[in-house]
């Protein structure tokens, strides 16, 4: 029986880090065996590639220095000639002879030595570049069988082998979304103003989760500036009593602040669990774990004590572990009893270890929002990662580098995703409570949800759908229509903005005692919507347990050929 994870930090250090390395190594070795790569031949080709790159860099460096010398000598030739022409009547004959000699010698050296040398070096550069292109083409050809074997699910398969009770869906299904709505109270209003960039759904300990990145537009402001210089004359009296007229000038400045659409992308982990079903709280990082002696810790502790004594503002009661209360700080919670059941002493201990560790984990870097049975983790370390998992990132022409990149990239992904789950794994009750569907099993209706449709549209790119006049990012939304042959037609609407240049005059008081209209140009952003269509078909074939990667890719090829579609991504074939 698989044991639950109650101390995610220790489990990662002692078990999962090395276990994932082993799984990653075995996965790459299996892919390489299937590809039947001649590793030694590729290494020899790559050695020649890198040797020629080094020679090419040296040749380019020499071309640079010879070019500098060429420019200097031409300046001497031209400069000497100009000096002779300008000073032939003023300079003594010996100075003119010296200038002439410098020009002539420079010209001779240019024509006899520098230009031929530059020509030889450029010819050598072109020859090496041609050889390098052929060698790289050969190396890519040697690696082509392996590059073809990478697919969209390679990381999720490795993670499921590494972490017990972690399962990933082939794509975000309508059943998974309906389960989140009906069983856990998920509210689709979250998606109203957002577009899904990518999503990965599944189960951990039988409870549903979604890792998603969304794009949202918020109307902010932008300030534009303009200026106008004014001139006037004044009559002044000097120290001797004489009156005279002087010219004055001043530059007047003005600004206009106008609405400006701003786009933000955020990555979240959404998790459903029926434990503590009425509990609501929100916490954000404060960096106070392990900082008991700091002034801020003492101040926050004092404020929590004061809030606990103030019964008018609610029934907040502090746990006996005050260090945890200050560091995790969920004083906005609505149910002390359910909170205490959820965050047991074991959970508090594991959470404190997680918050303090910045060597293996990421420390206190996450927001934790619990809205009854929906939990949302937004970790800072996830925001800069592209978790679309496009297999092209593994492809390369150098076997050894491809192997290194495969392990490095997937280790980064696993580390980041694992510690996004870690705050949830700290809570024993989240692992002890499982829904009926997870205990008894439930057949899933394999139809893709609108989350997956939006992610597919964003993968194809905004340029396929945006309005011709759109100058901003777009929020892509989709509508589906089932076709008679089992495929689905998606209508994609791209909501963006066009800009119109405006001119506004702002009245400013000048030093001449008058008001002046200062022009300020600014952009007005007006909404536009573009449209496009995607034809798609889900691949619901049940995969055999011991299927090889070649068999998997042959199956994908058959799907694309039969459906006349162009792209296979995450078990969905599609074309624009």
Q: Model features per residue range: what roles?
A:
Residues 70, 87-95, 182, 295, ...:
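Acidic, low-complexity intrinsically disordered regions
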